[in-house]
């Protein structure tokens, strides 16, 4: 009987710890998701300013960027090279990148993700592209860094018909 009572008490304690931990995890998760979204906001501001250094600092050393219609950029050096072509030119042309109003996200332990929509406007405010993104992050030394990042346009894919690029 003592063994059963001891096992029941142990089980009750385990349930209490798990349920209590779940509640703490939900609160912690909301805080972590907010931190992930804050990193997304830093990325957007840096892109719009053509600030490649700030953009690249948001990626882990061995992160992989998966741009649409192009090979993967593996590691910070390749990510820097890609963004060095994109961000300063976009800033110079007055393009404005923004994220949709309701991004999704989640966090569990040292991993988290964010997903949502984006809009790219020209300097007159005309929408030239809409799309969606998905980023996976890892928390390292208290900071969320992207480990995988991808996006794609809502527009139709480029034609694969031979000579389509030269047709009007």
Model-identified regions with their sequence ranges:
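Bacterial N-terminal signal peptides that target proteins for export
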Residues: 2-12
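Short, low-complexity N-terminal intrinsically disordered segments enriched in polar/charged residues
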Residues: 4, 21-61, 158-168
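Bacterial N-terminal signal peptides
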Residues: 10-21
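A solvent-exposed, acidic/Ser-Thr-rich amphipathic alpha-helical stretch
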Residues: 30-37, 52-110, 117, 127
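Structural motif
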Residues: 109-113, 132-134
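Generic short beta-strand segments
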Residues: 115-121
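Short beta-strand edge/turn micro-motifs at domain boundaries
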Residues: 130-155
